[in-house]
């Protein structure tokens, strides 16, 4: 990502991965070590914390089973978040108010330890956030592009 695509490191999660950016946003992608390659979640930026809450509550009104994790605030990027399952069952994040890095030379990446790599406040993440329930199926190739 850094050499081939020109991403810059914003912060590291000790022993697990790195927050990378290709814009002024604190991070555009988080790359983590895992037994197989997979997409953990997509994220959708909204205007402010009120929109994070309204969007999540609207979805949860008819589908409370889609709640994953939130409302909270990440330490890395300082953005507000709420994670939900989209209609296909994939993790999606509503977020707002992410830090920006307007000048690369003024930014020094930090190494975040433990839960600091995940969040500053809010409820703790559920086990399925840290180890997706379908990870075993991914590892044996049970998921495929053809369904």
Language-model-detected regions and their locations in the chain:
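His-enriched metal-coordination microenvironments in redox/metal-binding proteins
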Residues: 27, 36, 74
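A short, sequence-level motif marking secondary-structure junctions
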Residues: 34-36, 99
């Amino acid at each position: 990502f850094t050499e081939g695509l020109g991403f810059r490191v914003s912060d590291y999660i000790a022993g697990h991965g790195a927050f990378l950016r290709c814009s002024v946003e604190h991070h555009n992608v988080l790359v983590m070590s895992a037994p197989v390659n997979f997409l953990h979640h997509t994220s959708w930026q909204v205007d402010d914390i009120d929109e994070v809450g309204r969007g999540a509550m609207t979805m949860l009104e008819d589908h409370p089973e889609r709640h994953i994790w939130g409302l909270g605030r990440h330490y890395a990027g300082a953005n507000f978040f709420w994670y939900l399952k989209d209609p296909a069952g994939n993790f999606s994040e509503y977020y707002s108010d992410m830090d920006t890095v307007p000048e690369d030379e003024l930014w020094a990446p930090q190494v975040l330890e433990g839960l600091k790599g995940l969040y500053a406040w809010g409820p703790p993440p559920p086990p399925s956030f840290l180890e997706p329930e379908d990870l075993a199926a991914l590892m044996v190739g049970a998921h495929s592009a053809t369904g």
